[in-house]
């Protein structure tokens, strides 16, 4: 596999303030659960190395999310070598029934004893020589291949109030004068990148503003284009739009903000701070990335922009 951008959240983002880091506080993300769920929502696949109580909690949190569990893979150490089953009977019963779509890969780690106290010794694991063996590597690569998908983005009117949980489907319904829309995190990230291809939006982002003003601007543009696109399909006017994220109950602006953070950490855009003001610029990598994608937003010479179906 060719080398890709690797993003370690702790190397880019922090709670509170620290020089050289973007702060979660500035985009109103206050807890680690929301951050991890949003990161998982943006991802094609999720791999959890399950060897402790904390990873068990993470496994349960993701596996109980209908939108996330279908793209999960759990790496579990061989129970014989560590003399215990890391996936408990409760987790097994709750999430690993015969029709479960969660993939499991057993690996054979190096095991050592860690003395917590005189009477309590715990078995802990390492990858042998801190490397992934060819056999395990092939299994992981097979899962990655499975997760590669072309986002088939399409708009679908809800029937009987039921949301379509397919990643690429944007579900919508009209409730009085309000348009209610449900979008996956992956589609939002993809469409935000599309917005950054629009000259007028890029010009506004290059101006020095407070960070929340940039976020509100991108969020407003996103909602306006989405609103117009669906109104054209409904052939009906609605006054307001409410956009919800399928995977997690957070505000749309929080998702837009975190998508900008992720693009910055992946070196696709720059978020530059000068005193208390910020300006956002595009990097060459984003232009190259967008050139390899199908059109996301209608041409700029159209009077009103629309999001396009794939």
Protein language model regions, located:
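Conserved catalytic or regulatory cores that recognize and/or transform ribose-phosphate-containing ligands
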Residues: 1-59, 64-310
